[in-house]
Structures are given as C-alpha cells and as structure tokens.
From Swiss-Prot:
Source organism superkingdom: Bacteria
One example GO MF annotation: structural constituent of ribosome
Source organism of the structure: Protochlamydia amoebophila (strain UWE25)
Name assigned to this protein: Large ribosomal subunit protein bL36
Compositionally biased tracts (Basic residues): 35-45
Keywords in alphabetical order: Ribonucleoprotein, Ribosomal protein
InterPro entries in the record: Ribosomal_bL36 (IPR000473), Ribosomal_bL36_sp (IPR035977)
Family: Belongs to the bacterial ribosomal protein bL36 family.
A Pfam family of this chain: Ribosomal_L36
Length: 45
C-alpha cells in the first residue's frame, strides 16, 4: 500500500475512494496493487 499526502482515484481503472476511521483510502478489487492511503491524524492510544 502506498502512503501519500494527497491521493487520487481513477474510477475508469476501478478505484474506489473510501473513508475509514478518519483516513482516506483508495481500494481497487481489479488491481490490488493500486491501494493507497492518505496520511491522516495520528492513531489514538
């Protein structure tokens, strides 16, 4: 999974933007190597 400050999703390649627990993810079921996560707030202990 790539971790970037800014992520972009390309729906024509099957990317889906998902927000989970305050972080933004790009998931792709057709091509799992395209997974990305945006740097978000630090985890709570």
């Amino acid at each position: 999974m790539k971790v970037k400050a800014s992520i972009k999703a390309d729906p024509s390649k099957g990317d889906i933007l998902v927000r989970r627990s305050g972080r933004l993810y790009v998931i792709n079921k057709k091509d799992p190597n395209r997974k990305q996560r945006q740097k978000g707030p630090a985890r709570k202990k």
